[in-house]
Regions:
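N-terminal secretory signal peptides that target proteins for export/translocation
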Residues: 1-2
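Bacterial N-terminal signal peptides
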Residues: 5-15
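Noncatalytic, solvent-exposed loop/strand surfaces
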Residues: 20-601
Length: 601
């Protein structure tokens, strides 16, 4: 069994989840990724921390979950999922607020939020073995943030072998027996979402013991799940869309044809797992599964940590590089609006610069999306690697041709870099006391020369949190750039509570390929043999030239720095997310340690 080593930070704060199962109102819990099914990242119930008090944050405790980790895992995966927080859990020691997190080694831990002491922990054994050796793209580990059903006193989690476990919040005892297989073993999945008893997640990056039941066969004459140009009169042509786009990269997050070898594993490498969304109806004792495939192989996967976001009685998700041909079921670089439970396509938006995105490995799916209502209008925001931020009409995402946004602004990545720039995390949103709607994006690299923010909080060459306000101009909603934060190297998904934005500078190494000139400038030593000029960097290389994670608290309306953890965190993190709940803030890093911060005296 693989062991992981991660680090989690907890900062004291109150949480809210306003549409997760029975949870509503001004709750102080955090039962799912992003705090609610909409993935807003907004803690509506926090009162302890404020702009006036957050500067007094101090380290309260830290707890390590696992002791060992494979380098292949730690350089390509989050080592602990975003912590979840439930109040009033009736443990054997009495009612407690409990913090839950899942490690890459299949260990689910429940910690006392007051002390960090372990209440219970369970490590789940594999029922099958992976057929490919691990690497930093396909880590063969648990990756999906669990979800809590407070009404049933159950936390649901996905083990690496694809089994869905439901365990008791108070004791860790199994409540879902036997655990059903939900996803393909050792596939890459993202945060679970639970709505009306139906569980959702995404499957991407081609990892796992394929093939997938019901996966479509590639169309004749195509490669890697690509498509042929639509015939005259088909749906895409009638909608005014371009022909299907060929030559899509073979995986998300890196250029075509350059994925690390998947290894021999235990026999011949399995076929790539076709990218898809998946739902399981937990209300039905048979637990039926629905799947919606976005390609026939590796391309077009969804890999936002938010997974599927709930909005306007539907589910929103963005896909990555790949062929776009809706009549053939190929959905590269597309924001999809899906029906609950059945996952049928209700609407979609595909950026008009699709060819540029695919040619430069600018995954639209690297960012995230969320929906909200503004002055009686249902809106959606989204962004990806190319740094363009979109504001869409939820009732018609891309207009008649599915390619025309209501509003867009180029906010970052002028260089069109496939790594180190653009949006690599989910947005967040909140409404302030003046009923103003704000939206925040984590942008890697400097702001675009095309965008002018009203306020800058310093040079942001490595990355920043960007704040936009939704306003109406000429009867049409638009995004107005209000402020850009201090430099963050690099930012991840921010969260909001009581007028304060919480953001991290991850400290990670964002380089990926040996072809990147920065790789040779940094890694080539005088007198040493020449470094490779092709291929993807190794896990060991990606683990070098890192710094350490820093937590910041910023004024949500100005970006002014209110707090910095400075050197309190001595490790870096990757694909991490902040949790805000019940007077604490939680952040994970690669050594599977949970840090808890709260107000000092």
């Amino acid at each position: 069994m693989m062991r992981a080593t991660c680090l989690v930070l907890v900062f004291c704060l109150g949480g809210i989840s306003w549409k997760v199962q029975a949870q509503s109102g001004r709750s102080r819990e955090w039962l799912t990724w992003g705090g609610d099914t909409e993935r807003t990242g907004w803690n509506r119930g926090e009162t302890t921390l404020s702009k006036q008090t957050v500067g007094r944050l101090t380290l309260k405790w830290k707890t390590q979950i696992d002791k060992e980790v494979s380098i292949e895992i730690e350089s390509g995966n989050s080592m602990l999922t975003a912590p979840l927080v439930a109040q009033g859990v009736r443990t054997p020691q009495g009612p407690k607020t409990v913090v839950y997190t899942l490690s890459a080694s299949n260990t689910l831990a429940a910690l006392d939020a007051a002390t960090g002491a372990t209440i219970w922990r369970r490590t789940f054994d594999h029922t099958v073995e992976p057929r490919s050796t691990a690497n930093w793209i396909c880590t063969n580990t648990s990756t999906a943030t669990p979800v809590i059903d407070k009404g049933k006193n159950i936390i649901y989690m996905l083990a690496a072998d694809g089994r869905l476990h439901g365990v008791d919040l108070a004791t860790g005892e199994a409540r879902l027996v036997p655990p059903p297989e939900f996803v393909t073993p050792f596939s890459r999945n993202w945060s679970l979402n639970l709505l009306d008893g139906v569980l959702y997640t995404t499957v991407g990056r081609g990892c796992g013991n394929g093939p997938v039941p019901g996966a479509p066969a590639p169309p004749p004459g195509t490669l890697r799940g690509g498509g042929t140009p639509p015939q005259r009169g088909d749906a895409a042509a009638r909608a005014g869309g371009p022909p299907a786009q060929e030559g899509a990269p073979a995986r998300e997050g890196a250029p075509a044809g350059d994925a690390p070898a998947r290894g021999r594993g235990r026999g011949a490498a399995p076929p790539p797992v076709a990218a898809h969304m998946i739902a399981m109806d937990l209300n039905n004792p048979a637990r039926p599964i629905s799947r919606f495939f976005t390609s026939t192989a590796r391309p077009n996967g969804a890999w936002s940590r938010a997974g599927l976001a709930w909005a306007q009685n539907s589910l929103l998700v963005q896909t990555a590089d790949g062929v776009w041909n809706p009549p053939q079921g190929l959905w590269g670089q597309t924001l999809l609006r899906l029906a609950p439970k059945t996952l049928e396509v209700l609407d979609y938006f595909t950026p008009s610069n699709l060819e540029i995105l695919n040619a430069n490995d600018l995954d639209y799916g690297s960012g995230g999306t969320l929906g909200f209502t503004f002055q009686g209008r249902d809106l959606v925001v989204s962004a990806g690697k190319d740094g363009t931020v979109y504001l869409l009409d939820a009732k018609s995402l891309g207009g008649a041709d599915h390619r025309t946004p209501m509003f867009s602004i180029k906010a970052g990545n002028d260089e069109l870099s496939y790594a180190s720039m653009g949006v690599w995390g989910a947005p967040s949103t909140f409404v302030n006391a003046r009923n103003e709607r704000w939206v925040y994006f984590p942008m890697w690299g400097p702001p675009s020369k095309e965008v002018k923010f009203e306020r800058s909080n310093g040079d942001a060459r490595d990355g920043s949190i960007m704040a936009f306000q939704v306003v109406v101009q000429g009867a049409k909603p638009v995004l107005v750039p209000r402020w850009v934060s201090r430099n963050l190297a690099v930012p991840d998904s921010p969260v909001i509570a009581n007028g304060v934005i919480y953001a991290i500078s991850t400290g990670e190494n964002t380089l990926q390929r040996h072809t990147d000139p920065r790789y040779h400038a940094i890694y080539q030593k005088p007198g040493a043999p020449p470094l490779p000029k092709t291929g993807t960097m190794t896990a060991e290389e990606r683990g070098q030239n890192t710094t350490h994670t820093i937590l910041y608290a910023l004024d949500a309306e100005t970006g002014q720095e209110l707090y910095s953890s400075k050197d309190l965190i001595d490790d870096w993190t990757h694909l991490s997310s902040i949790t805000v709940a019940d007077g604490s803030v939680y952040v994970t890093t690669r050594k599977t340690i949970v840090y808890a911060f709260g107000l000092g005296k």
